[in-house]
Amino acid sequence: MLFKSIFISSLATSALAIYLPEDHYLAKAPAIQEGSCNCSGDNIRYNKSLASDYICGDKRLGPSRLPTKLPLGTFVTGYDRFGGLSPNDFLGKWYNSTQGPDGREAGWIYPEKYGFHLDEEKLPVKSNIDLMPGTLVDRFGYNTGRYISPATAPFAQRALHPQNLDNDVNKEFPNNYHVYNVTRMFTVQAGPIRPWFGQPGFGVQFFLGNGINVKDYLDNGHLVELKPSDLVKDRTGCGFQREDEEPVSDEL
């Protein structure tokens, strides 16, 4: 319990900080070349018309080329979208194709107990904290969801499946990536994210609670949506130099 208290305290301190915008360009990240992925297996749903844009021609596996401009911290570093598995084995482990009475598939398999990391007693590690005005948060998914995270948190720490990266509408940002500014204080359940979908997790998630979602907070003025590009700032001078730019001269 002492560890849990210390851990939550640390999370609360770091999570409430307003994340400074960073500019992360992934344009140099090459598209996954044909033949570099083993696309065999019964779990793969190959669609020839999608083969140039999605791994193995299957949208569930995410785009073959990552978004070119994504404000998500150390997005590329150490990111292995399949967690060491082949695409077929990844889908076999994390996707349930069983159809229900309505004919719809069960779909992605999500962790129990709201996705929080579990302690030695199998209880979720979480605590109530207040999100203060000016805090930037974001999420991958529609505003009908109940989860948000500190803006710009590394993707691998969110433990999300690769379909969240689909970017056929806008090549710079994933289709369903949303950024919000907290304008009125509200309370959330905060805690570490359980490793899942082959990802390391242990980022911070904010669970809004049962019976309430992001849209509710947008409607009542607690959140205001921003453009994802608002997190990406083009700045010059000391501290903002990129690798492909000339050094800033000290001379007048």
In which residue ranges do the predicted regions lie?
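A generic structural signal for short, solvent-exposed coil/turn residues
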Residues: 9-11, 129, 172
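Conserved NAD+-utilizing ADP-ribose enzyme module
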Residues: 18-119, 140-145, 154-252
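Histidine-centered catalytic micro-motifs used for acid/base chemistry in nuclease
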Residues: 150-151
